[in-house]
Amino acid sequence: MTQETLRKLWITLAILTLVVMINIHGSTQKSDFALIIKLPIELKFDGELTREAYAVHGMRFFALFFWLVPFLAVYHAKRSSGSASEAFPFRLLDIEPRSRPGKWVQGIAFVVLICLPLLTAIHLWRIVVGMQVCQHVSNALVNCADIWSRPVNAGPWDDTYRLANWGPTYDPLVEPVLAVILTAVSVYLTLRLVIEMRRAGSRPVATGNTPAEPITTSVT
């Protein structure tokens, strides 16, 4: 895969992730603002969801998909050289990443596409940890406990547990542990990206293969 193809793949995934996270963040605040991207498939939540339900779905999306954004950026940075700004895969029109305006553009892109989703995840996580998991029995919620507990034994595929306020089906203990692990992976990859960008800045610019000198013969 060429660097150009990798950049196209990365920017597509990064923008889609940013849009979803911003929209979910707004939904937890009961905001009417939403970013819309026309796609062959439509991504939306049906029905009136509670603030807690949006937070749960947002953490699920973030944990499952966001780590790919810094992962691809790290892969791009490891194959780059010349400057740290060029190692970051964002490109805007014909602005040279090593130029002064280019460095500003790359810095802003890093904050928006990498840091902003991480901050949104913190916001969603604060909502999730404040909720309770309850057993759903005969139109009633019983045996409520925090998200790290399993009040009663339940099979992995049933509908035993729901979040408070008749939220989505939720597997306590398992889901928050997986979310913490995958979020930690995303944070690690983000830190690794910063390191690889600095390393790229210390590597000499790749100049490619120089053409061979023509072979001349003399006739005596």
Curated annotation (Swiss-Prot):
Protease found in the keyword field: no
Predominant location: membrane
TM regions (residue ranges): 9-29, 54-74, 105-125, 177-197
Assigned keywords, A-Z: Cell membrane, Membrane, Plasmid, Transmembrane, Transmembrane helix
GO cellular component: plasma membrane
Membrane topology, record value: Multi-pass membrane protein
Subcellular locations according to the entry: Cell membrane
Disulfide bonds: none
Protein name: Uncharacterized protein y4fD
Organism: Sinorhizobium fredii (strain NBRC 101917 / NGR234)
